[in-house]
A protein has these predicted regions:
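Soluble "head" domains of membrane/secretory-pathway proteins
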Residues: 3, 11, 15-194
Length: 194
């Protein structure tokens, strides 16, 4: 399970939500457009990892839960974002109507935080094989691929950094729900890589 610490994925995910993540899917299939994925920080997008006090009783319990895989390792910083582009895709912001385009197809994004634009940052990128381009649903509050183009991977996330696909909000119970996959992105034609 993973904890949502920020509002970068609102309104799909709320601060404090706990989500179920399918880690096995990342081992056998590549991420698809529209999926919400958890991934390890590819190049210090979050800055340096926080130092924790391991001497307290609670810290020892948490450490044990990390060891058996129930909790994520806090020393490994994780992010959660929506996959917009996969290897071979061309992603552009924005078309004449202000929508993102993937492989020349303008997409509807009903999951974007109300009042946000698809992006205030213009870009035209080609996603290389073995990488994804990700964006938070709360575009004005998400430090995602758009804001990390000067990093080692030019804002892309290597597939090897993906921990799994977010599938279900499990806590609080009032938020219990499946996580949407962005159906409009499924309509985008696949570009064949040479």
């Amino acid at each position: 399970f993973f904890y949502i610490p920020s509002g970068s994925m609102e309104n799909t995910l709320q601060v404090g939500d706990r989500i179920g993540v399918n880690k096995f899917s990342a081992l056998f299939t590549e991420a698809k457009r529209g999926e919400v994925v958890v991934f390890g920080d590819p190049d210090k997008w979050l800055g340096d990892a926080p130092v924790s006090d391991r001497s307290s009783f609670v810290a020892k319990i948490k450490s044990g839960l990390v060891t058996v895989g129930v909790l994520p390792d806090p020393a490994k910083q994780y992010l959660i974002k929506r996959v917009i582009g996969v290897g071979g895709d061309n992603v552009i912001c924005c078309d004449a109507t202000g929508k993102l385009q993937v492989n020349g197809v303008s997409i509807k994004e009903p999951y974007i935080y109300k009042g946000d634009k698809p992006s205030d940052v213009k870009f035209n990128i080609d996603v290389p094989k073995g990488f994804i381009w990700v964006m938070g649903d709360h575009r004005s509050a998400s430090a995602d691929s758009r804001f990390n183009t000067d990093s080692a991977y030019a804002g892309m996330v290597p597939l090897s950094k993906i921990v799994g696909r977010a599938t279900l909000i499990v806590w609080p119970l009032g938020n219990l729900d499946y996580i949407s996959k962005g159906s409009d992105l499924k309509k985008v034609p696949v570009k064949k890589l040479p």
